């Protein structure tokens, strides 16, 4: 869906994802889907300026940019939009004052009214496309059963591993 939106709108697009791995994955996916040009990828230390039609970035890489930098974008797409409740992400969205097209995608809306209102303030009305049950019933998602396994360790083992560095 993000790729199709990116192809539909001719204006410059800013795609905000939560991790650097997703910056590279999304850019790679776009190439695989047939996008001929390079997506500009912004991660820590990367040049923030580009004439590319599509910029893919983490919020950590751009939240300190001035409002004037954001004026070049007319489309913003937030992947994993449920993470947009942080102050830095909200500040990015508030700097996009000349950006008429805003899209946020998530499969993990937490259900609280406050969170929903924050997302609607940043992106617009929430549209629920489908549910897990509907995906299972239409055979787009496998039926699954979750078994919880609780592991109980001795106090000695817990104390030994309490200071472990992973």
Named regions from a protein language model:
Residues 19, 57-61, 105-109:
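A short beta-strand-to-loop transition that corresponds to the Sensor-1 phosphate-sensing loop
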Residues 44-75, 85-91:
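Conserved helix/coil segment N-terminal to the catalytic DExD/H
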Residues 24-25, 50, 64-65, 111-116, ...:
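Switch/connector loops and helix/strand junctions flanking conserved nucleotide-binding motifs
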Residues 14, 27, 34-47:
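Conserved RecA-like helicase motor-core motifs
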Residues 164-166:
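Conserved helicase/translocase motor-coupling segment
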